[in-house]
Amino acid sequence: MGSAQDQTKKRKRQKVSDGSKSSKSRVVEADDQRELTETTTKPKKQKTEDPPTDETPDAEDVEQTENGETAQDDAAKDAEAPLPSTMGLSLPTDAAPQKFDELNLSEPTMKAIRQMGFETMTEIQQRTIPPTLAGRDILGAAKTGSGKTLAFLIPAVEMLSALRFKPRNGTGVIIITPTRELALQIFGVAKELCEFHSQTYGIVIGGANRRAEAEKLNKGVNLLIATPGRLLDHLQNTQGFVYKNCKVLVLDEADRCLDVGFEAELRQIVKILPSEERQTLLFSATQTTKVEDLARISLKPGPLYINVDHRKEHATVDGVDQGYIICEADKRFLLLFTFLKKNLKKKIIIFFSSCNAVKYYADLLNYIDLPVLALHGKLKQQTRTQRFFEFCNATQGTLICTDVAARGLDIPAVDYIIQFDPPDEPKAYIHRVGRTARGTKGKIGRSIMLLQPSEVGFLNVLREARVPVVEFEFPQKKIIDIQSQLEKLIGQNYYLNQIQSAKDGYRAYLHAYASHSLRSVFNINKLDLVKVAKSFGFTTPPRVDITLGASMSKDKVQARRPYGSQNKSARFKRRA
């Protein structure tokens, strides 16, 4: 930064107006401003595919420009325009601001923030937004539910506005997230934040119509939210995708991206995107060796490390009562049924360990007049999206799901998290619990984990991970005993027994248990299979095969194990 006199001279030489009052103007260096204005030399056009002329852009994916022109009209006028370096931007870096209006943000952004109902920043927002506005690369560690979505979206939108991005400039911000639901969640927040800006925004995710996505990218999407696989596909194969002007790359939930197998895709994406003037923000709830390696190849040397958790006594978010109930396997479903019956007016999320268990229990609960929504990875994307937003908008109801919904999603006003099946590790527990009381002061959520007597060793694992849990009592005499009716229903109902197979759910539960990462605690040989089978509505355990293959951890050898109705001495012998 120069002296006040130098700054005055620069302002006299060049000023970039954003259409608002002159006091709100953004200042850039003179050389950069000359690049921003349209040059007399016509830039080389990038080869594109002509989108169908009869298709109108989706209002939610591609917004209109300030002058009422659509992104398609704007893109047709010219090829992508060169943009200045972000290094010339003079953005506010006031020390330790507490409220959004102390950041000197543009009026369209402030108007959107006020409309969203926010006034005071969370800690991650206080510590991240000012240095990000100043152009620093960020390596952030924050709990789920801490408010980091706005922490990276606000600077991203401000940058696009300050540089006056047009659709013809292509994509200036790319946000990568591990799951489709989280991408949709971020897209919803971006839509609200961009309401009073002229910049366009969009989303590309697996399971959606790829051709429609490509057409929107051809028209120009300034802010793009994406899942790694689909983004890499467009980077490599969509010729009209203008990404050379990408100024900001956000890697959200980076540890989760790596956990679910996107390491190779992320490395290729980072390599393809321009790096010289790119600002990168990497957020991860946990810091692992793989996350550090990804940070090394994506961030500039000397990034700002922001950790809002290290001073916290507990690893989970505040405002959540966390506890567990010791329950025999054959009482688990009866306890769940009783709990749901007594809390029909509450908003509840229940976690299971497998898709087949979710499918079975969803059909069972709906059949016995306990309405629930099911969310798991085997659903079509349109169905997943519809159910996710249906539950988000509901004031009461029950969602049963796998961990596909456990990471990063902001589901409003959840009263209870029920972990029907224990998580695979403390990290998964933390993200499940993060679905309730997300960044809201005064909101108390409750998390309840069901543990069998043989699983109490998991409590020591949680305590070592700084997760506070207490034992909740649920009197046995209050449990509604419908076991005989349940067994009769499963025995006689063809749909539940064969079509939505209780047997498939039972097999999937045993498979997940056998492949648990904490096998010293969750030992399948300690399970009482008769009691486990009763929780699925069987009078005797059905015979099922469990395949443990190479996709699991190294200490698991390939084997095929039969479980079910056989004599006790032979029950756990491997088949030759």
Swiss-Prot record:
Quaternary structure, from the entry: Associates in the nucleolus with the 60S and pre-60S ribosomal subunits.
Keywords: ATP-binding, Helicase, Hydrolase, Nucleotide-binding, Nucleus, Ribosome biogenesis, RNA-binding, rRNA processing
Name recorded for this polypeptide: ATP-dependent RNA helicase has1
Residues binding ATP, per UniProt: 142-149
Family: Belongs to the DEAD box helicase family. DDX18/HAS1 subfamily.
Gene (name only): has1
Principal location listed in the UniProt entry: nucleus
Ranges of Acidic residues composition bias in the record: 51-66
Catalytic activity entry: ATP + H2O = ADP + phosphate + H(+)
Motif Q motif: where in chain: 98-126
GO cellular component, one term: preribosome, large subunit precursor
Gene3D superfamilies: P-loop containing nucleotide triphosphate hydrolases
SMART domains, A to Z: DEXDc, DUF4217, HELICc
Subcellular location field: Nucleus, Nucleolus
Any one Gene Ontology BP term: snoRNA release from pre-rRNA
Helicase ATP-binding domain span: 129-305
Organism of provenance: Aspergillus terreus (strain NIH 2624 / FGSC A1156)
Motif (DEAD box): 252-255
Composition bias type Basic and acidic residues, residue spans: 26-37
MF terms (GO), sorted A to Z: ATP binding; ATP hydrolysis activity; identical protein binding; RNA binding; RNA helicase activity
Pfam families xrefs: CTE_SPB4, DEAD, Helicase_C
